[in-house]
Amino acid sequence: MFIKCVIGGILLFIGFVGHTNQLYVAVASNFYSTLQQISSEFTASTGLKVVITTPSTGTLYAQILHGAPYDIFLAADQKRPDELVKKGIGESKFTYALGRIALGSIESFPEPTTEDSLKKSFRYLAIPNPELAPYGHAARQVLTTLNLWQPLQKKIVMGENVGHTFSLLATGNVDLGFISLAQALSRTNRTNTWFWKVPLALHDPIRQDAVILNKGNMEDAKRFAAFLKSPVVRSKIRQFGYDLPELPR
């Protein structure tokens, strides 16, 4: 499946060759809905259409290594952007958001979702694949910190990324799932009792870095990077459930 995602992402671009006025953005699945909202404003002000691709951070990283011609990569970690800079594939790296995770429950879950929900009776718990998705890595850290990683092994269902995990939860295929706080807040038809905002003390910080890719449309990618750093856009990113890093002076 992973190899198919890598090849599929590269083939996706065959039909794009020669197109102008488009910016190709590879974005981690947790930030997809947020990017959809803010990219429309970028298009309105610049005339550039933003074309978004959104598997897991690990899958996007592999696609870039295999030549997928994205212009800018918005990861859910620092590791992959760092590696791209070291390999001479990317530059101008910066942190655009600090991710937060939440534990969500299905509609019929009998009580408010809290840390204790993990210690009670349920069928399945979905988490993003820790090897591919930074939010999955954080979820594994949470369970390990709570001494639940081994006891819950038979109940854990792995999603490819946090978007897949959210789908498993939304369709009722699992009772509980670790998702991004942004996804939790997006479900406006639910009360806040359906998710638990995981304390930062239970996992390492999720620093989400962006990197401009050297083989892409660097001029417009830099315009988009400046757009992400603007006060108005940073305020909107916070509204979607992210913390914000301090910008370098």
Q: What is each model feature region?
A:
Residues 20-45, 51-54, 58, 62-68, ...:
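Exported/periplasmic ABC-transporter solute-binding proteins
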Residues 1-7:
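Bacterial N-terminal signal peptides that target proteins for export
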